[in-house]
Amino acid sequence: MVLIRVLANLLILQLSYAQKSSELVIGGDECNINEHRSLVVLFNSSGALCGGTLINQEWVLTAAHCDMPNMQIYLGVHSASVPNDDEQARDPEEKYFCLSSNNDTEWDKDIMLIRLNRSVRNSKHIAPLSLPSSPPSVGSVCRIMGWGAITSPNETYPDVPYCANIKLLRYSLCRVYQRMPAQSRILCAGILQGGKGICKGDSGGPLICNGQFQGIVHGGGKTCAQPYEPGLYIKVFDYTDWIQNIIAGNTTATCPP
């Protein structure tokens, strides 16, 4: 019930405190209740909101810029007004960042690994999503999902998570249209004609390509889902060694350069 009250307040407030670079799903539809079992909600009472991905019973992967004070983590949520009987709440026990990941100039290190204070129980609405076994291919159809705004620039927020299909594009397109630096650890995805994409509130959520967890929502254009403004995603495959080392207890592991 605490989550329901907080999310309802967030929807009423229209996320007035939404963090810089947070993004939403535009042009999508309500996610099937069973297709977002790994999607988690990160929020606090001040109105900050992000998504994340459960990668095993104790760990969540999200964007570094989603870090917030007094973070609460909820799993198994589908409706802000109608709770599931298997929703679970957790607090962050530990947070791990890549070196300089809180520096906005480090585009390719916007990644945060969160250890939960208690293990999560798998259920009908909760299950982890494995790390990718191989990198994605340009042209792949990818699924985005989140609680972000569904209209832009005048933002409205849904009662349920929204999902949409987009395509993985050549990174060179994001360099041109988003004026991004020449980074190899960023994925570029979207619909060049516009109409579908991430928006405020979806930051930290997953990009799932051909069933594999390939990206973490980083950001997009100032107005969401515009033509020639594809979204930017952290390339999860490049960080699998760092993630696995941290989970194994090697907390001094360094990120790829």
UniProtKB/Swiss-Prot annotation:
Residues 19-24 form a propeptide. The active site is at residues 65, 110, 203. Expressed by the venom gland. Pfam families: Trypsin. It is found in: Secreted. Residues 1-18 form the signal peptide. Keywords: Disulfide bond, Glycoprotein, Hemostasis impairing toxin, Hydrolase, Protease, Secreted, Serine protease, Signal, Toxin, Zymogen. It is an enzyme of class 3 (hydrolase). The keyword rRNA-binding does not apply. Belongs to the peptidase S1 family. Snake venom subfamily. This is Snake venom serine protease 3. It comes from Protobothrops flavoviridis (Habu). The lineage of its organism: Eukaryota, Metazoa, Chordata, Craniata, Vertebrata.
